């Protein structure tokens, strides 16, 4: 679909600025493999300029600065929500074109960013609620002292976001950081930065103070790493692979810098024998093929009770073959291309390795015959799995699900927890007591019961084990960007009397 990509520069201190080294990165449409534009490539020199701008914005006009008044910030967040709603169709087109996700999904993503009950509007309310929490009293055992708590913004934060939900994942970080009073330097993925740059224009249009949000597109080693290691960045929040997260954690540790990491996953979905098969099959497909399979929390390890496995898998194959794979702008598209040639090759290698290790490719596993161009992969179901196989252990980040059977509840839990990851999991059963037992036993940060993937801004999001730590969203998300300060006062007129007066 022909749709012009706006030509943008880096967004620094409220202005569009050419990168100091003047380099650009091509934008490739994953549906056609064609170059459709380019984005600026920031380097350490640009990071320095952006951090200075963010620090200046954080300190500007003492008493009336960005960090001072919670309600002052809330009005900007609401203005951003309104402006994105106004430009919704523009953002949807760009997101679909740049990322390859079906247009219907892009609509939902942009709605989540903008609508009054979601991200910016929600965190605007959180910003106002923080006014009420300031100076919250602390009960002490000694009457001569009184104590209260202050919540203050951490400072300048570095935000590094992924390519699977470009603007939405940016919003998960930007909204709470700004609501908390921080100023920010954002580095989106070079594979999908277009809507993130357009967000800078929205900030200008609503009059966001210069330097509060700075947007640097570029490669991880050139732009992301300098953000993490910069001594004037007070915190880093990252969403991406566990391998990159480990490097960020190691770099930040040199300065004892706090980090929030939302990393990879290999999430299980457990199907007990009492389920409604048709309902459960649809949720299973949604849990792994949504966003073209590129979901950190994808429930890509299906554990199904042996008594219903044959029927369940048969219905799953039929449902899967009915999924419309097409150009993401086509009406009814439910699976588009993966993000890049590199990702396409990686996923196909996973499928090839699974076959060589003895697994069966029951459905899919190759390029759709009717799509000769673009990074399209058929939704793939793999059976005859052993727990030693790569496909069982490693995150694929594509439209691939592996299937294994179990006999007992204990075996299902053991198999579900047989992973170094712990982002999410799902359990399906009409026995809600069993669901509660399994929920408590799963070593994950989020559990879905009789569904997969619904995510709401009001609930915490994050993982355990190698899926990271810290929580985004809800009141937990804004606390990520606040320092807690204890203030204790002596309210007695009597001397302390510990030392003898000379």
From Swiss-Prot:
Pathway: Amine and polyamine biosynthesis; betaine biosynthesis via choline pathway; betaine from betaine aldehyde: step 1/1. The record marks 164 as: Transition state stabilizer. Keywords: Chloroplast, NAD, Oxidoreductase, Plastid, Transit peptide. GO terms for molecular function: aminobutyraldehyde dehydrogenase (NAD+) activity; betaine-aldehyde dehydrogenase (NAD+) activity. Residues 1-7 form a transit peptide. It catalyses: betaine aldehyde + NAD(+) + H2O = glycine betaine + NADH + 2 H(+). InterPro entries: Ald_DH/histidinol_DH (IPR016161), Ald_DH_C (IPR016163), Ald_DH_CS_CYS (IPR016160), Ald_DH_CS_GLU (IPR029510), Ald_DH_N (IPR016162), Aldehyde_DH_dom (IPR015590). It is an enzyme of class 1 (oxidoreductase). This is Betaine aldehyde dehydrogenase, chloroplastic. It is found in: Plastid, Chloroplast. Belongs to the aldehyde dehydrogenase family. The keyword Kinase does not apply. The active site is at 262 (proton acceptor), 296 (nucleophile). PANTHER family: BETAINE ALDEHYDE DEHYDROGENASE, BETAINE ALDEHYDE DEHYDROGENASE-RELATED.
């Amino acid at each position: 679909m022909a749709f012009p990509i706006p030509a943008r520069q880096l967004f620094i201190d409220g202005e569009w600025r050419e990168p100091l080294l003047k380099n650009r990165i091509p934008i490739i449409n994953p549906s056609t493999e064609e170059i459709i534009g380019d984005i600026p490539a920031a380097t350490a020199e640009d990071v320095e300029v952006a951090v200075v701008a963010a620090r200046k914005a954080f300190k500007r006009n003492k008493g009336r600065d960005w960090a001072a008044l919670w309600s002052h910030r809330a009005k900007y967040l609401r203005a951003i929500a309104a402006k994105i709603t106004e430009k919704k169709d523009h953002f949807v087109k760009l997101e679909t074109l740049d990322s390859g996700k079906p247009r219907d999904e892009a609509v939902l993503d942009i709605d989540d960013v903008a609508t009054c009950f979601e991200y910016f509007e929600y965190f605007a309310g959180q910003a106002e609620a923080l006014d009420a929490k300031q100076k919250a009293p602390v009960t002490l055992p000694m009457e001569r002292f009184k104590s209260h708590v202050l919540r203050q913004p951490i400072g300048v934060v570095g935000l590094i976001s992924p390519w699977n939900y470009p603007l939405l994942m940016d919003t998960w970080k930007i909204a709470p950081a700004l609501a908390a009073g921080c100023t920010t330097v954002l580095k989106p993925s070079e594979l999908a930065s277009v809507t993130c740059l357009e967000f800078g224009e929205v900030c200008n249009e609503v009059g966001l103070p210069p330097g509060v949000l700075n947007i640097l597109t570029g490669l991880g080693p050139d732009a992301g790493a300098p953000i993490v290691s910069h001594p004037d960045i007070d915190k880093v929040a990252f969403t991406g692979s566990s391998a990159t997260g480990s490097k960020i954690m190691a770099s930040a540790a040199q300065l004892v810098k706090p980090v929030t990491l939302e990393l990879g996953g290999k999430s299980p979905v457990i199907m007990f024998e009492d389920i409604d098969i048709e309902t459960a099959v649809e949720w299973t497909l949604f849990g792994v093929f949504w966003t073209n399979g590129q979901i950190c929390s994808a429930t890509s390890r299906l554990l199904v009770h042996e008594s219903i496995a044959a029927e369940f898998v048969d219905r799953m194959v039929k449902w899967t073959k009915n999924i419309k794979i097409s150009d993401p702008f086509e009406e009814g598209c439910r699976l588009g291309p993966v993000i890049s040639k590199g990702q396409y090759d990686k996923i196909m290698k996973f499928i090839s390795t699974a076959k060589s290790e003895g697994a069966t490719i029951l459905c899919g596993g190759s390029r759709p015959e009717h799509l000769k161009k673009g990074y399209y992969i058929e939704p793939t179901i793999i059976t005859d799995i052993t727990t030693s196989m790569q496909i069982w252990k490693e995150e694929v980040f594509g439209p691939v699900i592996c299937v294994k059977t179990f006999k007992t509840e204990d075996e299902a839990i053991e198999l579900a927890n047989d992973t170094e990851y712990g982002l999410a999991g799902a359990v399906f059963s009409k026995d809600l007591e069993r669901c509660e037992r399994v929920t408590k036993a799963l070593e994950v940060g989020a559990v879905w019961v009789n569904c997969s993937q619904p995510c709401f801004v009001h609930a915490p999001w994050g993982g355990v084990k190698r899926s990271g730590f810290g929580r985004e969203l809800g009141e937990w998300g804004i606390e990520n960007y606040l320092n807690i300060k204890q203030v204790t006062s002596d309210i007695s007129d009597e001397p302390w009397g510990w030392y003898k007066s000379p």
